[in-house]
Amino acid sequence: MAEPMILDGNDVSKRIKDKLALQVAALEQKGVRPCLATILVGDDPASATYVRMKGNACKRLGIESKKIELPKETTTKELLAVIRELNNDSSVHGILLQHPVPSQIDERAAFDEIAIEKDVDGVTTLGFAQNAFGFAHYPSCTPAAILAILDHYQLPIEGKHAVVVGRSPILGKPVSQMLLNRNATVTICHSRTENVSDFVEKADIVVAAVGKPNFIQGEWIKSGAVVLDAGYNKGNIGDCEYDGCAQRASAITPVPGGVGPVTISMLLKHTVEAAERSV
């Protein structure tokens, strides 16, 4: 098999941000500065890093980043009050509650408190339902990034058999719905699926979203398949055993530098679009 096409997320991300810079400038002409509010509950180091990365990405593009840090003892009631305040703040266009939250908080209730027009990461129940029906303004950012990569490289989706390994509500489930809405035939595998390899071996498109390092083995990949690795594990390792998968795939995302950069760009894109809709 020839060398696979490397699906460079940094390149896709740059193209998205170049276009967004023009949109931000146009909004500034109207006296509007896009604003993303991020809520971090507790002091989890990984979550703090993710919030900082998102804030830095906002600033580089001229988007205001409003960071709200709450103590880990915060109650559901207190968090809901903070979200309601942001909902009522017309200068805030997007609200992101960093996942996961401490165990005493009802995360679903917190997500669903976010106003649908500010749900730039597609986490509300209503946003999830709109995504399933194919008319969400703001689908979950990582699934949106996966579709953006496929489209950027003009890789066909319609009529292809896509196997999604993972069923999380912020990745596996929504990306399955988005692929289905693009006329792929979709199979979802999960922790209770027996013989996952039997399904992956038949896939034209493999989406790895299982959260286990090197879970997808190279010998599982059908020759010529497209592999999108949405996993990011300790040591900069994805969910796919990269070298083995790359030997059989026609196209593959690296980790890091694949899906991750595009995910952040989709968050920025949704925030700018929310600001445009507010004018």
UniProtKB/Swiss-Prot annotation:
Keywords: Amino-acid biosynthesis, Histidine biosynthesis, Hydrolase, Methionine biosynthesis, Multifunctional enzyme, NADP, One-carbon metabolism, Oxidoreductase, Purine biosynthesis. NADP(+) binds at G166, R167, S168, S191. It catalyses: (6R)-5,10-methylene-5,6,7,8-tetrahydrofolate + NADP(+) = (6R)-5,10-methenyltetrahydrofolate + NADPH; (6R)-5,10-methenyltetrahydrofolate + H2O = (6R)-10-formyltetrahydrofolate + H(+). Pathway: One-carbon metabolism; tetrahydrofolate interconversion. One of its GO terms (molecular function) is methylenetetrahydrofolate dehydrogenase (NADP+) activity. GO terms for cellular component: cytosol. GO terms for biological process: L-histidine biosynthetic process; methionine biosynthetic process; purine nucleotide biosynthetic process; tetrahydrofolate interconversion. Its EC number is 1.5.1.5, 3.5.4.9. It comes from the Bacteria. The keyword NADP applies. Homodimer. Belongs to the tetrahydrofolate dehydrogenase/cyclohydrolase family. Catalyzes the oxidation of 5,10-methylenetetrahydrofolate to 5,10-methenyltetrahydrofolate and then the hydrolysis of 5,10-methenyltetrahydrofolate to 10-formyltetrahydrofolate. This is Bifunctional protein FolD.
